[in-house]
Amino acid sequence: MPSVTENFDLTNGFNILRIICGAFFVPHIYAKFFVPEALGFFVAAKFRPPKVWMYVSAAIETAVAVALVLGIYTMYAAALAALHLTIAVVAVYRVTGGKWLWNIGGYEYCLFWAICCAVVAMHG
C-alpha cells in the first residue's frame, strides 16, 4: 500500500488524474443537496423513487470522491465511479434523446469522466 506522501506526489501523473477524478465529484454531491433542480433530473430519468436514488447517488459519489482523493482502495473506488458514471451516461442519453455535447445537456462530460475513472481503475 502506498504511503501518504506517495499518494500525494504530484510529480506522478497518475496521482493527479486520480485526485482530479475524485475532486470533480464534489460539485455534483453539493448539487444533490442544495440545488432543487437536481431532483428534476432523477424524475426525468424515471428513477423511482427519485429522491431515494438521488441520495444513493450522492452517497456513492461521496464514497468514491473521498477514496479517490485520498488514494484508498483506488482500483475499487475508480471501478465503482466508472460504473456509476456509465449509468449516468445512459440516464442522460435517455433524458436528452441522445444529445452528445455537454453544453447542451448531453452525455459527453459523463462519458469522459467514466473513461478517466476506468483508466484509474486499470492502473490502480
State where each predicted segment sits.
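Extended, low-polarity transmembrane helix blocks
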Residues: 1-34, 51-59, 63, 70-124
